[in-house]
Amino acid sequence: MAITQERKTQLINEFKTHESDTGSPEVQIAILTDQINNLNEHLRTHKKDHHSRRGLLKMVGKRRNLLTYLRNKDVTRYRELINKLGLRR
């Protein structure tokens, strides 16, 4: 299921770096993580939905690229985000 506008606004408010921030890597990664988690739940019940699985793999790749960018740019922001989102256990 797609992410709702309220949930997206909530994620933006939680991860923004300044007042009018909507496109920082932190916000983009948080939104992608929420979408990935929702799609993961969908695929647990609909195992043969290969079209959605491809979309999931594209989202995971995009998130990986954004995480690599953030790690190269600022390691402390990267580590804070990883801990906040619960990634890389």
UniProtKB/Swiss-Prot annotation:
Q: List the PROSITE patterns.
A: RIBOSOMAL_S15 (PS00362)
Which GO annotations describe the biological process of this protein? translation
The membrane-spanning stretches of this chain are none
Return the InterPro entries for the record: Ribosomal_uS15, Ribosomal_uS15_bac-type, uS15_NS1_RNA-bd_sf
Keywords, sorted A to Z: Ribonucleoprotein, Ribosomal protein, RNA-binding, rRNA-binding
Q: Name one GO molecular function term.
A: structural constituent of ribosome
Highest taxon of source: Bacteria
Q: Which CDD domains match?
A: Ribosomal_S15p_S13e
Q: Name one Pfam family in it.
A: Ribosomal_S15
What Gene Ontology cellular component terms go with this record? Answer: cytosolic small ribosomal subunit
Query: What family does this chain come from, according to its entry?
Result: Belongs to the universal ribosomal protein uS15 family.
Function in brief = One of the primary rRNA binding proteins, it binds directly to 16S rRNA where it helps nucleate assembly of the platform of the 30S subunit by binding and bridging several RNA helices of the 16S rRNA.
Q: Which NCBIfam families match?
A: S15_bact
Per UniProt, subunit arrangement is: Part of the 30S ribosomal subunit. Forms a bridge to the 50S subunit in the 70S ribosome, contacting the 23S rRNA.
Name of the molecule in the record = Small ribosomal subunit protein uS15
Give the organism the record lists: Bacillus licheniformis (strain ATCC 14580 / DSM 13 / JCM 2505 / CCUG 7422 / NBRC 12200 / NCIMB 9375 / NCTC 10341 / NRRL NRS-1264 / Gibson 46)
